[in-house]
């Protein structure tokens, strides 16, 4: 066992003394059992994580029952909804790297034999996922689960995205204060990750097809007894993985990454999943995984399930309709869409895991014969603004919009754009360009949920587009193109767009272009000032120095002269 490094031999007597002092060693025989880390992310200010201490206790009990010795530690977490619209959002994506580094540090410093990861919200799941393939210790994931959808006084289903869009409607005068306050009070009625197919739930669903979590992980409610049963079940599976020495890199292969994007396309997941899954591929040592490959997957996978913010359906509706397993089963039966014979943490293949799954409500999950669209709900765009690619959630765009051509109105920050939208400087026919908000430029690639929600809240969801080297919340909908690469701070051509330039977003052809000759763009480049970091000290300064653009997954890159 790995843990023998800290508990066997005369030299480890001091370590054994310290282990006895933890209170986790209940009998002499415990030193001969596998040591299992519980990587938790309990935090009081994140509603998706307030109940995770209780779930960790369930995991501890089950791990002991299955023959292991549990040791819990905690990571940090950022709530994107609370951190939205101010400097806190600049810490959100960077927190992914802190979480990965922290988990790596504890796991490798203490030579654990297995790891039970309990994430839930936006950057916590991918951060832990990066740690799992980096340390490559037998591991399993079981998230905290989604919250229930809210309900307004008028009987309308609510999610957090309802509140963000209500801000724009209230400012516009099209919503009463009474209705506005009703939404605020009732949109998030329980603990758990936000109720729509936003980033947290998208990632937790992808864990099922990656093979790192048991069926039900993505949709079983946080407040249900079934969530506790998933934790127990996962603990026993983890002990089998430890016994058989099945490791994350045995499960997370190039085929698994392909299948994650296939499910993402079928359920119209958050665009942030593209960032995180590309980063995962890099961390797992999977080479040459790029945005063009994702487009190829999108072309062969139908769009089967529209969930909030693209519809009124919540994650609980998906669960009742058959869950992620029902969507995966449709892809298995489609043939050629995924690789169903890959091994998973259950010891079974994907095909075996979903063999008995079925669709219980064809309004929530469409059968493969009747998809929302024959192609996936996410699309990668390329063109002279985004030579390395950009991302759009086509499932969140009104179907009547196939090509959008408009006049650029440019901003160098999120805040400038929000002010212009709110004071009606932005009008019908505009393409709002927000640059210098990428991983390096932001820094931290903040989400542009406030401007997109204001656009939709003003009733301009089909009439105004927004493009950015920043990113979007999973709650974003509308004509919103993000992750433009290279970013402006890295000299990307989005920095060369001027007010009044005509920009064309062509969804069928997956292109994003500005109608300006190449030679004019090159002349503009000569006048472009050198980018200077916005933050000079602390973690964000270090992050700025090392981070890369979105087409890599926004990973940190060590200078080559330090590793050659």
Swiss-Prot record:
Pathway(s) where this gene product acts: Amino-acid biosynthesis; L-isoleucine biosynthesis; L-isoleucine from 2-oxobutanoate: step 3/4; Amino-acid biosynthesis; L-valine biosynthesis; L-valine from pyruvate: step 3/4
Record-listed Mg(2+) binding positions: 80, 122-123, 447
One Pfam family it belongs to: ILV_EDD_C
Binding site for [2Fe-2S] cluster: 121, 194
Gene Ontology biological process terms, A to Z: isoleucine biosynthetic process; L-valine biosynthetic process
Documented EC number(s): 4.2.1.9
Catalysed reactions, as listed in the record: (2R)-2,3-dihydroxy-3-methylbutanoate = 3-methyl-2-oxobutanoate + H2O; (2R,3R)-2,3-dihydroxy-3-methylpentanoate = (S)-3-methyl-2-oxopentanoate + H2O
Gene Ontology, cellular component aspect: cytosol
UniProt keyword Hydrolase, yes or no: no
Keywords: 2Fe-2S, Amino-acid biosynthesis, Branched-chain amino acid biosynthesis, Iron, Iron-sulfur, Lyase, Magnesium, Metal-binding
Task performed by this protein: Functions in the biosynthesis of branched-chain amino acids. Catalyzes the dehydration of (2R,3R)-2,3-dihydroxy-3-methylpentanoate (2,3-dihydroxy-3-methylvalerate) into 2-oxo-3-methylpentanoate (2-oxo-3-methylvalerate) and of (2R)-2,3-dihydroxy-3-methylbutanoate (2,3-dihydroxyisovalerate) into 2-oxo-3-methylbutanoate (2-oxoisovalerate), the penultimate precursor to L-isoleucine and L-valine, respectively.
Assembly and interaction partners: Homodimer.
PANTHER family noted in UniProt: D-XYLONATE DEHYDRATASE (PTHR43661), D-XYLONATE DEHYDRATASE YAGF-RELATED (PTHR43661:SF3)
Name the UniProt record assigns to this protein: Dihydroxy-acid dehydratase
Recorded name of the encoding gene: ilvD
